[in-house]
């Protein structure tokens, strides 16, 4: 039985998000021996973490436009290849000083910024509407799976080898992914040589997206209330998520006198504490996606399903923070 091509698109996009996050969170653990070796202050560590987002916010803003214009396959593929090369180069830049690290982190952010706009552009053309919520949920689970893998494997590599090998090995994974992405994925379903006529018909009927997006003025976009609401929700979500991703390992490792838990990097408890949140995140992401699609199939209003599940996630997170 032939696997539908759109499922391969979902799997490869999941891997792209997975690689995006292992390359993003590896420094959250690697920074511990790096700070000790290079003598960086806590303020410098914070700047290193933040510099990534200077590049990220720029290409994330234009990533959707680029993907719609040149194809999601092209933008995501070359974005991932570039950030993988920047990951491999990170140790070399670290040995050339603090500002060199900031520079390579900005470049890494520039590469990673196109990830989410690109695969969303792909899904608008590849994924039938009734499958879209769970497809997005599965792909987004790459965030948590990548975080779990990144934290765990970074800790193991540092313990048995060195922090430099974290960046070398993770970067090479992206290069390998790029090879398979180029060979097996296309930006549009009708371009794929192995797609069946039945699958192509299903996609055309259930995901009727034009290859050329409609033009919309910036003023109209910025004054659109649903757009504003989604932007605020995304800001609040990402504020908590990225602080958590960046600082959780350091918080667990830092001495009690400095407000941390004082648990050593080579401790099993350290590994357990950094993994628990992401493991539960994987479960809730996938379950939430399937639940949403199930409710929509039962004729619940799409907007109500989105609002309820989003509110459960936000209020649940706020509750446990208190």
Task: Label every model-predicted segment.
Residues 8-42, 244-249:
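Extracytoplasmic
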Residues 139, 143-192:
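Helix-loop-helix hairpin linking two adjacent transmembrane segments in secondary transporters
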Residues 92-104, 162:
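Helix-loop junctions at membrane interfaces in 12-TM secondary transporters
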Residues 27-28, 223-286:
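Extracytoplasmic gate region of multi-pass secondary transporters
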Residues 81-95, 311-322:
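C-terminal ends and interior cores of transmembrane alpha-helices
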Residues 104-144:
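Cytoplasmic helix-loop-helix junction between adjacent transmembrane helices
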Residues 50-65, 275-288:
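Central cavity-lining transmembrane alpha-helices of secondary-active solute carriers
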């Amino acid at each position: 039985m032939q696997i539908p091509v759109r499922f391969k698109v979902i799997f490869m996009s999941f891997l792209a998000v997975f690689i995006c996050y292992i390359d993003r969170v590896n420094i959250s653990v690697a920074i511990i021996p790096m700070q000790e070796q290079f003598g960086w202050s806590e303020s410098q560590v914070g700047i290193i973490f933040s510099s990534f987002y200077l590049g990220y916010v720029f290409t994330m803003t234009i990533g959707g436009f680029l993907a719609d214009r040149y194809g999601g396959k092209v933008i995501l593929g070359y974005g991932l290849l570039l950030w993988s090369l920047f990951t491999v180069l990170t140790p070399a830049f670290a040995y050339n000083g603090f500002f060199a690290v900031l520079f390579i982190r900005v470049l890494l952010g520039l590469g990673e910024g196109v990830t989410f706009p690109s695969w969303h552009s792909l899904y608008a053309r590849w994924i039938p509407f009734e499958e879209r919520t769970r497809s997005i949920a599965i792909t987004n689970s790459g965030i948590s799976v990548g975080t779990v893998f990144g934290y765990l494997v970074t800790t193991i590599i540092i313990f048995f080898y060195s922090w430099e090998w974290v960046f070398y090995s993770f970067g090479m994974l992206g290069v390998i992914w790029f090879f398979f992405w180029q060979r097996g994925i296309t930006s549009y379903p009708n371009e794929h040589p192995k797609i069946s006529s039945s699958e192509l018909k299903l996609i055309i009927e259930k995901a009727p997206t034009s290859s050329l997006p409609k033009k919309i003025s910036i003023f109209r976009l910025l004054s659109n209330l649903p757009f504003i609401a989604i932007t605020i929700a995304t800001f609040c979500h990402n504020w908590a998520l990225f602080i958590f991703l960046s600082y959780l390992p350091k918080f667990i490792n830092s001495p009690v006198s400095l407000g941390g838990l004082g648990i050593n990097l080579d401790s099993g408890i350290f590994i357990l504490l950094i993994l628990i949140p992401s493991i539960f995140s994987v479960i809730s992401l996938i379950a939430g996606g399937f639940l949403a699609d199930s409710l929509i199939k039962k004729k619940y209003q799409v907007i109500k399903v989105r609002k309820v599940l989003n509110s459960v996630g936000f209020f649940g997170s706020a509750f446990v923070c208190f």
